[in-house]
C-alpha cells in the first residue's frame, strides 16, 4: 500500500490500482502525465499520532483534517512535516495537504479565529518556508518540479493549468 505519497495511478475504477503507480520525480516527466486514463494522487498525511491518545492508551489517527476537534497545533505541524509526501529528487520539499471538508459553520471559529492566527504565527517563526496554495496551484508546482524547475517561485502556481476565467 502507498501512504503519504505523490504518484500517478491508472484510473480503472478498481480501488486496488490506488496501491500502485508511478512516483513523481523531480526533472522527470512520465509518459502517463498527460494520459486521460491516469490520475495524479497527492496524499494528505496519514500517521499514528502518539502524542494524542484515545483513552490515554491508543494513538489517534492523523488524517490531515482541520476541525474544531482537530485544530492545527505545533505538535501536529511537526507530525505533518515528519510524514509529509516528498518528491524523489527534492526531499527538502514537503507537501502538507490539509482539508476542511468545505469549512462547515461549526469550524469557522477555529479556521478564522485565534487558533488559526496563533498557528500561522507559529509556522511563520519556523525555519521551513510555507506556501498556502489551492489544489490547482499545488498540481502546477508538482508539474513545474517534474519539468525541472528549481526553487519555489510564484510563476510555478500557473505553470501547467491557468487560473479559472473568473480570477
Language-model features and meaning:
Residues 1-92:
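Active-site-adjacent pocket scaffolds in enzyme catalytic domains
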Amino acid at each position: 500500500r502507498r501512504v503519504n505519497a505523490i504518484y500517478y495511478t491508472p484510473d480503472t475504477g478498481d480501488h486496488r490500482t490506488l496501491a500502485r503507480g508511478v512516483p513523481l520525480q523531480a526533472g522527470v516527466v512520465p509518459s502517463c502525465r498527460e494520459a486521460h486514463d491516469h490520475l495524479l494522487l497527492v496524499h494528505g498525511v496519514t500517521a499514528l499520532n502518539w502524542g494524542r491518545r484515545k483513552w490515554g492508551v491508543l494513538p489517534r489517527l492523523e488524517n490531515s483534517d482541520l476541525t474544531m476537534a482537530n485544530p492545527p497545533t505545533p505538535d501536529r505541524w511537526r507530525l505533518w512535516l515528519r510524514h509529509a509526501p516528498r518528491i524523489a529528487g527534492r526531499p527538502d520539499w514537503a507537501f502538507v495537504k490539509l482539508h476542511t471538508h468545505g469549512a462547515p459553520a461549526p469550524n469557522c471559529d477555529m479556521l478564522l479565529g485565534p487558533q488559526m492566527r496563533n498557528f500561522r504565527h507559529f509556522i511563520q517563526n519556523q525555519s521551513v518556508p510555507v506556501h498556502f496554495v489551492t489544489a490547482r496551484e499545488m498540481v502546477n508546482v508538482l508539474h513545474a518540479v517534474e519539468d525541472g524547475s528549481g526553487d519555489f517561485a510564484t510563476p510555478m502556481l500557473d505553470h501547467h493549468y491557468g487560473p479559472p476565467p473568473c480570477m
